[in-house]
Amino acid sequence: MALPNQQTVDYPSFKLVIVGDGGTGKTTFVKRHLTGEFEKKYEPTIGVEVHPLDFFTNCGKIRFYCWDTAGQEKFGGLRDGYYIHGQCAIIMFDVTARLTYKNVPTWHRDLCRVCENIPIVLCGNKVDVKNRQVKAKQVTFHRKKNLQYYEISAKSNYNFEKPFLYLARKLAGDQNLHFVETPALAPPEVHIDIADQQKNEAELLQAAAQPLPDDDDDIFE
């Protein structure tokens, strides 16, 4: 159910649901946006925190009401009330934990069962960590389902804005939309090796040109 205070702003606002296994960094990611963290509200009936994240675009201000599960996914699936009226979504996994990627199809299925035809971004978090278990070339689910994929590092703010910009463009139907101002973000807690990450991004591009494997299970053999 949409929050009573959700449509009080006089500029476009959207419900953004963030899903993925516990411990993948969803809460850390949302809390990087300082204004949203300051203005968050708890919705006890569903057990979620809702963070209002504002972004400034060349077409004006927009707001994402980011629904964060507050860790309840660790105790079973999420209730439909979490997904209902969702207008866009982020599915997050942890590149240092293989199982969190293997569970992405389940999250995608649960999401699409309630929210049909909404823009979805897949995010591989924690790319700042050295012992990566899910290599860039092994991430293929987004290609099978026509999702956008970004490698991110919540703790270093790496690529923080990209999922939001992609979703904003999709929701506005305007590929030329861009952010004109950086939101206030928490200072980086870690630093990412940009040279290393550029190699990963290059690997992603190369993988995109290859035929898809028949089954995701094959990629971890």
Swiss-Prot record:
Species: Arabidopsis thaliana
One Gene Ontology CC term in the entry: Golgi apparatus
Gene Ontology MF terms in the entry: GTP binding; GTPase activity; mRNA binding
Family: Belongs to the small GTPase superfamily. Ran family.
Classification lineage: Eukaryota, Viridiplantae, Streptophyta, Embryophyta, Tracheophyta
Presence of the UniProt keyword Nucleotide-binding in the record: yes
Spans annotated as Switch-II: 71-87
Compartment annotation: Nucleus
CDD domains in the record: Ran
Induction remark: Regulated by light.
Keyword Thylakoid attributed: no
Segments for region (Switch-I): 40-48
Source organism, top-level taxon: Eukaryota
NCBIfam families, A to Z: small_GTP
PANTHER family assigned: GTP-BINDING NUCLEAR PROTEIN RAN-1-RELATED, RAN GTPASE
Protein name: GTP-binding nuclear protein Ran-1
